[in-house]
């Protein structure tokens, strides 16, 4: 009888789940299959941990820890404390060469490179709105954009300039930031409380982060499909 009751409860939840929540769950499964994030059981924590990869966006209402590694990329963490939903993105601006990155400026929000950053921010915000968050209640924390050696130094700087300009223009409630600097970071985020933990790591330990970001940068397609973002009021 207990098994039957549990199964009925699951079916009931599915039948009466809103279309937007069902769409969000389907989207999350597609993104996990594409490698945008990975979920796993932490050996010393009862919660699931979710690692967001470069180019990924993840939002949840579950008791989970979201984490990532950041070199020149940036991450925005956002949450609605009343609805207990939150999420994280992980992105950089794609530049074809050093000349392009040198001549880009943060007010150029309509450029191809900026459109990619805008897309990453919009997906995160709209994902949370689809889960019941209110835009006026959303709070943000911004991380990353390290000035790494060589060409990547410019990329990190431009990523920081972009995310700060975007937050200013969109009037986002940014309550904390840890941007720039010369070292990569490891970032942990509790999406229900908004608490975040940052650890700076040495370059000898950051090879995997740099490799992931380089692979991501080479794979970026700057033509963002207009029908990939659903807007919620």
Swiss-Prot record:
Entry EC number(s): 3.5.1.44
InterPro entries to which the protein is assigned, alphabetical: CheD-like_sf, Chemorcpt_Glu_NH3ase_CheD, Cytotoxic_necrot_fac-like_cat
GO BP, one annotated term: chemotaxis
Molecular-function GO terms, alphabetical: protein-glutamine glutaminase activity
Reaction(s) the record says it catalyses: L-glutaminyl-[protein] + H2O = L-glutamyl-[protein] + NH4(+)
Entries under NCBIfam families matching the protein: PRK13493.1 (NF010016)
Family according to the record: Belongs to the CheD family.
Protein's job: Probably deamidates glutamine residues to glutamate on methyl-accepting chemotaxis receptors (MCPs), playing an important role in chemotaxis.
UniProt name for this protein: Probable chemoreceptor glutamine deamidase CheD
Species whose genome carries this gene: Vibrio cholerae serotype O1 (strain ATCC 39315 / El Tor Inaba N16961)
Gene that this polypeptide is encoded by: cheD
């Amino acid at each position: 009888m207990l098994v039957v009751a549990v199964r009925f409860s699951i079916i009931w939840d599915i039948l009466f789940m809103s279309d937007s929540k069902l769409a969000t769950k389907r989207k999350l499964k597609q993104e996990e299959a594409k490698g945008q994030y990975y979920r796993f059981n932490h050996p010393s924590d009862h919660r699931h941990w979710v690692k967001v990869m470069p180019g990924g966006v993840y939002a949840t209402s579950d008791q989970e820890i979201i984490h990532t590694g950041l070199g020149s990329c940036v991450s925005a963490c956002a949450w609605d404390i009343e609805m207990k939903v939150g999420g994280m993105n992980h992105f950089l601006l794609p530049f074809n060469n050093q000349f392009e990155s040198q001549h880009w400026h943060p007010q150029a929000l309509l450029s191809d490179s900026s459109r990619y950053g805008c897309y990453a921010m919009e997906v995160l915000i709209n994902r949370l709105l689809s889960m019941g968050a209110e835009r006026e209640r959303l709070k943000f924390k911004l991380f990353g954009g390290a000035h790494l050696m060589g060409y990547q130094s410019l990329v990190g700087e431009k990523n920081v300039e972009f995310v700060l300009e975007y937050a200013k223009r969109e009037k986002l409630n940014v309550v904390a930031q840890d941007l720039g600097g010369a070292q990569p970071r490891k970032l942990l985020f509790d999406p229900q409380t908004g608490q975040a933990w940052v650890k700076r790591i040495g370059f000898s330990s950051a090879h995997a982060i740099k490799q992931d970001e380089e692979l991501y940068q080479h794979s970026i397609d700057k033509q963002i499909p207009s029908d990939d973002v659903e807007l919620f009021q």
